[in-house]
Every structure is written in C-alpha cells, then in structure tokens.
C-alpha cells in the first residue's frame, strides 16, 4: 500500500503520473491531495511527469475538448474521426484565448481578463490597468527564476490612422499584482497569430517599412521584442498561421502565390528559447490549394509521427447562411479528408483549435494585505 510508504517516496512516484490521472487520484488520500496543492511538488511534476497532448477548441465563445483519432489512416483500416467531447471550464463567454504552460489567458465578451487552469479548475481574474483601452491584446508568459516560473502578462495596443501610429505596452506582474508601462519596445510591425513556447510569445509579423515578413518574439525576461527568420523570404509567399509542436518546435503555414500550393514548415533547432537567434527549418508537408481554396482564417496542429496536419476553419454556407465548422485532415500522397462538426451563427467568432498540455501549475494569487486594526481610544472621565 502506498499509504505505508515514506512521503518523499510517494512524492517521487506521484511526480511521474500524468496530470489528468493525478487529478483523479487526489481524493484517494489526504497526503496525496496535499501534494497536489504544494507548489514545490507541482513544479517538480511539470518537469518529470509524462506529457499529455490534448486538443481544445474555442467555439461559440466556449472551450470544448476534442477527440482526434488518426490511427491506421494510411493503411486504410479506419477512417479518421474527430469528436467534440463537450464544453469544459467555467461559465464565461470567451472572445479570445491564449495558452501558456498549462494555463489559459481568456478575454471575455464582457471585457474581463481571466487566467484559468482547465486541469485543476483554478481561476483568477486580473484587473485591467487604469490605462486599458478597448481592442487591447493580451498574452501570457513567464521567466524562469531558479526553476520557478514567474508569470507576466503583456498588454499591447496599437492605433493607426494614415501615417500616424500610437502604441502602448504594459506588463502585469503576478508577484506584485500591478501593471507598469514598458518603453522602447515598439517592433514597428503588424502582428497576428500569437503562440507561446518556453514562456515567450511568437507572432507572425510584417515589417511595412522593409516590406518583409518575419517571426517576432517577445522575451519576457528582458521585456523586449526580437526578430527571427521565416523559412522563406520571397515575396511570392504569404504567411497564414503559426503553431507549436509538442512544446519544442514551431511550425508555420505558408501560401505560395506562384503555384497552387500551401506548405507547412517545422523548425529543427535542438532547442528554441530566448537565446535562439536563428531558426532552422525543414518542409513538413505540401498541400494542393485546390482542396482548400475556401480557407479564410485557419488554426492547425501537426502529428509528426503520422506525417499529418489537422486544420480548423469556419466558412459561410447553407440555406440559412450559417457558419459551417470544419476540420480538414491532410497527409502525404495527397491524402485529404473533411469532417463537419456543426454550424454556428455568422457573427460568432471563428473556431480556434490548439494543442493543450495539462498541468498542475498553480495560478499565482494576489497578495491580500490585511487591514490594520484601529485601536479603540479609552474614554477618560
């Protein structure tokens, strides 16, 4: 019985159990549940435990878990299947979502900013800065401090009018529960399609002054932007989407204007972190554009072992002009399959699919400063 084992040995065993399995075990024993709440243990668990790569989807302002089965496709033994498993998480209308280190940074339709761990169910609302402006964008990142993650949020806001541009950049630090402006970080780029890797944020970007596309990284340790290279710099290529591969590499979807092809490229660096200055790329998959001409705003992830890519998009169609939610599975030898997962109103946000790695990481809570008790004055008679 594990209950008779020394506590340090129990911790060592539990630290290797996947997060979702450990979540189910927490009610088994009080000491196990205490491990679950111990920050030291959760940090050790995030390093040692086997990673689980799940798929989540933001659809109609709610997050759903997605079951994806790509087994035996190339052998024609079974057809691929994608199933929405149902809505997960708190009852809030989510308009934007960003995944980092097992945490989801959510912006809501009623203009709130929430941090949520779907694995533990923990949430925390972050109050907006007094300088907050509508249409601000937010990303979550962290800095490694002696193997501990120090979390921060970047708020960025841009205003354009003809040749006039105004930008604001603020950092929220969880440790101090406060916002502060940061200066001299303006990348002079238009950005889209942000993803998180090893605590830093990466965007697809365009430098209008130099007329080039690139990848832009925000390094949370120095709070500065850095420029990185795409696989191809030719003007006859367009960047469409960015994705993360098993928390180790980046992948990018490119559209060729000179041929009827889209291409997925994957980085091959030994590691990618804040010290990486140059990205090394290899072509992962070529896609015939004639099979996906109607794509408008895709999100995607890849399966390296099966040499396949799964795309998600929504397009307007049908008698009632509803937005059809579609998954597209594409592989080698011109393998192509469409899977319909439901309709949504036109005005709802486009579906967004992403890999999610469950984690026991605890959301830092704001420090509550107790009020000083006033001394009662004694009546002198």
From Swiss-Prot:
**SMART domains for the chain:** FBOX (SM00256)
PROSITE patterns the record matches: FBOX
Instruction: Kindly indicate where the leader peptide sits in this chain.
Output: none
- One protein family per Pfam: FBA_1
Q: Which domain of life is it from?
A: Eukaryota
Q: Using the record's annotation, list all stretches that form the F-box domain.
A: 1-45
Looking up InterPro entries in the UniProt record yields: F-box-assoc_dom_typ1, F-box-assoc_interact_dom, F-box-like_dom_sf, F-box_dom, Gal_Oxase/kelch_b-propeller, SCF_F-box_component
Q: What is this protein called?
A: Putative F-box protein At3g17500
């Amino acid at each position: 019985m594990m209950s008779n084992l020394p506590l340090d040995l129990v911790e060592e065993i539990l630290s290797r159990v996947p997060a979702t399995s450990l979540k189910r075990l927490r009610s088994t024993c009080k000491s196990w549940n205490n491990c679950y709440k111990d920050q030291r243990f959760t940090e050790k668990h995030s390093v040692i435990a086997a990673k689980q790569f799940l798929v989540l989807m933001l659809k109609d302002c709610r997050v759903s878990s997605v079951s994806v089965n790509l087994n035996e496709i190339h052998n024609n033994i079974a057809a691929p299947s994608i199933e929405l498993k149902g809505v997960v998480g708190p009852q809030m209308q989510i308009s934007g979502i960003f995944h980092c280190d097992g945490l989801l940074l959510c912006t809501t339709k009623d203009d709130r900013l929430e941090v949520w761990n779907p694995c533990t169910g923990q949430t925390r609302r972050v109050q907006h800065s007094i300088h907050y402006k509508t249409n601000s964008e937010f990303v979550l990142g962290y800095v490694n401090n002696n193997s501990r993650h120090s979390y921060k949020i970047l708020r960025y806001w841009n205003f354009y009018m003809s040749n006039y541009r105004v930008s604001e950049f603020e950092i929220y630090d969880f440790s101090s529960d406060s916002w502060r402006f940061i200066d001299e970080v303006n990348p002079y780029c238009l950005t889209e399609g942000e993803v998180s890797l090893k605590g830093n944020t990466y965007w697809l970007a365009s430098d209008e002054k130099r007329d080039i596309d690139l990848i832009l990284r925000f390094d949370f340790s120095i709070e500065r932007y850095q420029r990185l290279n795409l696989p191809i710099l030719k003007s006859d290529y367009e960047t469409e989407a960015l994705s993360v591969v098993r928390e180790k590499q980046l992948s990018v979807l490119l559209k060729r204007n000179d041929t009827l092809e889209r291409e997925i490229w994957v980085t091959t660096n030994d590691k990618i972190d804040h010290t990486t200055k140059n990205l090394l790329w290899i072509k992962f998959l070529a896609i015939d554009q004639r099979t996906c001409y109607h794509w408008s705003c895709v999100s995607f992830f890849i399966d390296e072992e099966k040499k396949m890519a799964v795309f998600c998009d929504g397009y307007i169609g049908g008698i009632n002009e509803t937005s059809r939610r579609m998954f597209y599975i594409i592989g080698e030898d011109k393998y192509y399959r469409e899977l319909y997962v439901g309709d949504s109103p036109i005005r709802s946000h486009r579906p967004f699919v992403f890999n999610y790695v469950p984690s026991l990481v605890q959301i830092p809570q704001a420090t509550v400063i107790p009020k000083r008790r006033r001394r009662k004055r004694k009546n002198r008679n």
